[in-house]
Amino acid sequence: MADFYQNGIVTTLHNLENRSVEALESELNEFAKKRPLGLILPSLFSELEGKALPATIDHIAKVPYLNEVVIGLDRATKEQYQYALKFFSHLPQQHRVLWNDGPRLQALDEELRKLGLAPKELGKGRNVWYCMGFVLASNRVESVALHDCDILTYDRSLLARLIYPVANPQFNYEFCKGFYARVADGKINGRVSRLLVTPLLRALKHTLGQNDYLEFMDSFRYPLAGEFSFRRDVLNDIRIPSDWGLEIGVLSEMHRNYSHNRLCQSDIADAYDHKHQDLSLNNDQGGLSKMSIDITKALFRKLATQGTVFNTETFRTIKATYFRIALDFIETYHNDAVMNGLKLDIHSEEKAVELFAKNIMKAGTSFLDNPMETPFIPSWNRVVSAKPDVLECLLRAVEEDHKEFLGQ
């Protein structure tokens, strides 16, 4: 059973009673009559052939309260898009697949590129951005959840607990972030959150002093969780990063746009496992190494927008402070693991901390050397201002793809 402690300045909604998914779904069915609910699934084609997504779709097919499911499909040929249409066709809910590599959406992307408004990098951020645009264009839902497609431990209760806070009309939340314990196969996972993000936030607070943004970020129990839910109006104004800083960037945007009492986090799963990234000790352009650099730069950029001045000496101090805090965390997690009968390899943990410490300096150098770097994709409000018919064009492209290849 979870505790009921409220840490930080963001409301935490706990799983206190293991309430049945049927009871949650019964309420969500009633909420959906007045506030239609949707789901965004950003996916790579390769995930359709894995273990996680087929099982996930079987669960989603049984969800009674969804009015729309939007699937963003990346890295797919024409034949693979056709396969995807059949793969998702047994979903009883209204659904559409965005073929991001198809000629129609590529043509729209090129139009936006000429206006300087297209996402500059391929990846999850770009995929999510176009899915958000489609939700705005289709105008079928008032609240929408988003989660990854590689969750090996998925069940319907995860989605129900994720979307409930923005579905309940008696709640005033605009945004909800999921959290869970990353424990699987007898060990504690979640290295980047445990060994980079939390100790780095503590180091920044120690180095820079009291800061509302850092207090806000440190309130989230699992800041890198890929599971969110939003009210529809959030999608108009949000600017999201196109790199690995997506999860941090979304939280930063929520901090910028909304007061703390409109935001919450929800305990959505007792167990959670997904595909794991390599540490990439010798390649800072891949795996957890690149992820750590992108995340760290996202934090530095946000702090700079608030007036924090960075220089090489500052980054050295942050790195040294981080290193000591992170090493202390390893001992804490080791003791937690031992008491719970779990494994935790201290040597591997310290190698990760050493890599992350180096990458804090790399992120700082990159931040200083590239002051004009703008990884954020423009908000849909800005895109509509520049191209007023963009949402209609997006909707038409997706519907024409669907009609051409599925014949419906």
Where are these regions (language model features)?
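A recurrent flexible, glycine/aromatic-enriched loop bordering the glycosyltransferase active site
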Residues: 185-194, 208-227
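Catalytic donor-sugar/metal-binding loop of nucleotide-sugar-dependent glycosyltransferases
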Residues: 242, 252-271
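Conserved donor-nucleotide/metal-binding helix-loop-beta segment in metal-dependent transferases, i.e.
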Residues: 152-182
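Terminal low-complexity segments of carbohydrate-biosynthetic enzymes
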Residues: 1-17, 92, 278-408
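Active-site donor/metal-binding and catalytic loop motifs
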Residues: 264-285
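N-proximal low-complexity "stem/linker" segments adjacent to membrane-targeting elements
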Residues: 1-62
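Active-site-proximal specificity loops/subdomain of glycosyltransferases
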Residues: 17-20, 80-140
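Short beta-strand-to-loop acidic/aromatic patch adjacent to the donor-nucleotide binding site
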Residues: 138-152
